[in-house]
């Protein structure tokens, strides 16, 4: 697979889909997300590690019941097996990119809405 070199912050800011996979290789995956105001990602736990970088908006991170605030430039690392959720608390969508290691979503995954993502859940 060729190297990936793009402005990830611009890609995340421009993304309007709830979830959009943009890169998957053998050991990692990059996914863009846009969470509408008042909505959340949905409580979940993965079998893989997850790193989230917040690009714009404001929100709340909930990891194993512990709550903290997130905003542009926040980084949250979610170890495999950690129960987590992220809530968009501002007036604009919470925009972020996330890195899974190893990959979590199928290559080419696009979920335009949270409902679409929930219908496709595999965990």
Where are these regions (language model features)?
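A short, N-terminal "cap"/entry segment at the start of jelly-roll beta-barrel domains
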Residues: 1-27, 111-123
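Short histidine-centered beta-strand/loop micro-motifs
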Residues: 20-23, 33, 41-46, 87-89, ...
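Short, charged/polar surface micro-motifs in flexible loops or helix N-caps
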Residues: 26-28, 37-39, 58-60, 67, ...
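A generic "binding-loop/recognition-motif" signal
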Residues: 28, 37, 47, 66, ...
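Short, conserved beta-strand element in jelly-roll/cupin
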Residues: 34-36, 45-61, 99
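Short beta-strand His + acidic residue motifs that chelate non-heme Fe in jelly-roll/DSBH
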Residues: 41-43, 61-62, 78, 84-90
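Short acidic-glycine-tyrosine-enriched beta hairpin
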Residues: 66-80
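Ligand-binding loop in jelly-roll beta-barrel domains
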Residues: 80-106
């Amino acid at each position: 697979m060729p190297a990936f070199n793009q402005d990830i912050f611009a890609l995340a800011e421009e993304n309007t889909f709830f979830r959009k996979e943009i890169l998957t290789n053998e050991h990692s995956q990059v996914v863009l997300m846009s969470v509408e105001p008042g909505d959340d990602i949905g409580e979940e736990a993965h079998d893989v590690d997850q790193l989230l970088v917040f690009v714009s908006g404001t929100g709340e991170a909930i990891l194993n019941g512990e709550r903290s605030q997130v905003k542009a430039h926040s980084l949250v690392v979610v170890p495999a097996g950690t129960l987590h959720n992220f809530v968009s608390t501002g007036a604009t969508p919470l925009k972020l990119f996330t890195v899974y290691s190893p990959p979590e979503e199928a290559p080419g995954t696009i979920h335009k809405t949270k409902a679409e993502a929930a219908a496709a859940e595999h965990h």
